[in-house]
Amino acid sequence: MVRIAGRELPTNKRVDIALNYIYGIGPWRSRQILKELKVDFSTRVKDLLVGEIAAIREYIERNYVVESDLRRFELLNIKRLIEINSYKGKRHKMLLPVRGQRTRTNARTRRGVKRIIDLKGV
């Protein structure tokens, strides 16, 4: 098992695909990392040399904020928006879309399941 940034990578996948399992590293960034370290994209994780694994691990830790650190950073940014009482903070607090999307229709994922109120007893 190869463990990078606190995450175990699947051994049978190509390296560029497997790096996507790390939160904060997408397809573009994984290829940039492999180009920088001169590792072939088509290499399987199980075929990586110990030195290559160590180089990838060190490069990611030195240059990128990933996994739990990135999640914490994002959460702190949202908390800051809520504390300063900004419009975006209010939208986060009310669990509504933040970036100007309409809410009269759609936004079902963010707002939750529609509930039908039974008014027979009233």
From Swiss-Prot:
SUPFAM superfamilies: S13-like H2TH domain. Transmembrane segments: none annotated. GO terms for biological process: translation. The keyword RNA-binding applies. Keywords: Chloroplast, Plastid, Ribonucleoprotein, Ribosomal protein, RNA-binding, rRNA-binding. InterPro entries: Rbsml_uS13_C, Ribosomal_uS13, Ribosomal_uS13-like_H2TH, Ribosomal_uS13_bac-type, Ribosomal_uS13_CS. Pfam families: Ribosomal_S13 (PF00416). It is found in: Plastid, Chloroplast. One of its GO terms (cellular component) is chloroplast. The keyword Hydrolase does not apply. One of its GO terms (molecular function) is rRNA binding. Belongs to the universal ribosomal protein uS13 family. Located at the top of the head of the 30S subunit, it contacts several helices of the 16S rRNA. Part of the 30S ribosomal subunit. This is Small ribosomal subunit protein uS13c. It comes from Cyanidium caldarium (Red alga). The lineage of its organism: Eukaryota, Rhodophyta, Bangiophyceae, Cyanidiales, Cyanidiaceae. The gene is rps13.
